[in-house]
Swiss-Prot record:
EC number of the protein: 3.5.3.12
PANTHER family listed in its UniProt record: AGMATINE DEIMINASE-RELATED (PTHR31377:SF0)
Record protein name field: Putative agmatine deiminase
Gene: aguA
Gene3D superfamilies named in the record: L-arginine/glycine Amidinotransferase, Chain A (3.75.10.10)
Catalysed reaction equations from the record: agmatine + H2O = N-carbamoylputrescine + NH4(+)
Annotated GO MF terms: agmatine deiminase activity; protein-arginine deiminase activity
Native species: Shewanella baltica (strain OS195)
């Protein structure tokens, strides 16, 4: 167990000025970060089910990449008994466990040096539709992770969650208007100003804007639940053939955009369709295990924003969520077809979905750089 004190060196320049860029997820990784789930007003049974699931996710990742887990001091002893022994536990305060959204975006340069971008965070909407209050500890998470690795830090003047962007490492950024242009994130910035900031801090050139994310996604339509890059020039889209499903118009509109765009290198996109599970709904038993607090209520009968697109690429592995016995095998087969050179590892992940996200949402990769 190690301790991360907040003291990452802050830079006054921007990554693009310094020759740094965000690499694609399939670039070599030195580590993956996760955070211990414990909020009783978001995770049933005070997080016990989620903790067991996080342990399985950490174990699956650990077969390919070292795993770090931020854990509040009060839960360190418990985490040590639950987490696989190969996971490095780091004492770290947080308001919840969404490492993708509160962790840093690590950027690299041609020499293999790593630095981190620390974005603003307001719990997916602040006092205008945000998911909990306060979020002050979450605002310190990125800095603590960067300190652990000894990386210098860029502080970006933009409210942004890591789950709201995907890049191909070759100049293209994909995102959703539902999230990035939402009035509860950066109401004083225009679309053009947001793009300029993403150019500065991700060093990208071209943007692919999808309108909406997955139906009922409480993050306001994060791209990482809806669509991702498989490799340069190829994307994977969350899909349903059921035209009566509320998801259909969202996926169809996204497909129309993807079919009529090019990436930063001028390539037309090859589009893979990954079928949605379910539809899936929260049960009464699952909702009763969540206590009342400042978190968003978990209501029986509420549709869950389940998506197989919410997977992690980590070195030679794809770690994806198992969500529905009727479609899990189809998703695994499709992923193996898309990624023949990768080991496809499924982890039962309904407990993460009940809390509002999935495997990509609870992980944040640290690229190797070199």
């Amino acid at each position: 167990m190690t301790n991360a004190n907040v003291d990452a060196t802050q830079l006054t320049t921007k990554p693009s000025q310094d020759g740094f860029y965000m690499p694609a997820e399939w670039a070599a990784q030195q580590a993956v970060w996760m955070i211990w789930p414990y909020r009783p007003d978001n995770w049933r049974s005070a997080g016990a089910y989620a903790q067991a699931t996080f342990a399985k996710v950490a174990d699956a990742i650990g077969g390919a990449t070292p795993v770090y887990m931020g854990v509040p001091k009060a839960f360190l002893a418990e985490a040590k008994t639950v987490m696989p022994s190969h996971v490095t536990l780091v004492e770290m305060d947080s308001n919840d466990c969404w490492a993708r959204d509160t962790g840093p975006t690590v950027v690299v340069n041609a020499e293999g040096e790593c630095r981190g971008v620390d974005w603003g965070f307001n719990a997916w909407g602040g006092h205008n539709g945000g998911l909990y209050f306060p979020w002050d500890k979450d605002e310190q998470v990125a800095q603590q992770m960067l300190k652990q690795h000894g990386f210098a830090r860029y502080s970006a003047p933009l409210i942004l969650e890591g789950g709201s962007i995907h890049v191909d490492g070759e100049g293209t950024c994909m995102t959703s208007a539902e999230c990035l242009l939402n009035a509860n994130r950066n109401p004083d910035l225009t679309k053009e100003q947001i793009e300029d900031l993403l150019r500065d801090y991700l060093n990208v050139k071209q943007f692919i804007w999808l309108q909406d994310g997955v139906y009922m996604d409480e993050t306001d339509g994060h791209i990482d639940n809806m669509c991702c890059f498989a490799r340069p020039g190829e994307v994977i889209l969350h899909w349903t053939d059921d035209e009566t499903d509320p998801q259909y118009p969202r996926s169809k509109a996204a497909l129309d955009v993807l079919q009529n765009t090019v990436d930063a290198q001028g390539r037309k996109l090859k589009i893979h369709l990954l079928p949605q599970p379910g539809p899936l709904y929260c049960t009464e038993e699952e909702s009763l295990g969540v206590t009342e607090g400042t978190g968003v209520p978990r209501t029986a009968g509420e549709r869950l924003a389940g998506s197989y697109v919410n997977f992690l690429i980590t070195n030679n592995r794809i770690v994806f969520p198992l969500l529905d016995p009727t479609t899990d095998d189809i998703a695994a087969q499709k992923l193996q077809e898309i990624f023949p050179e990768y080991e496809i590892v499924g982890v039962p992940a309904r407990e993460i979905l009940l809390g509002g996200g999935n495997i990509h949402c609870i992980t944040q990769q640290i690229p190797s750089g070199k």
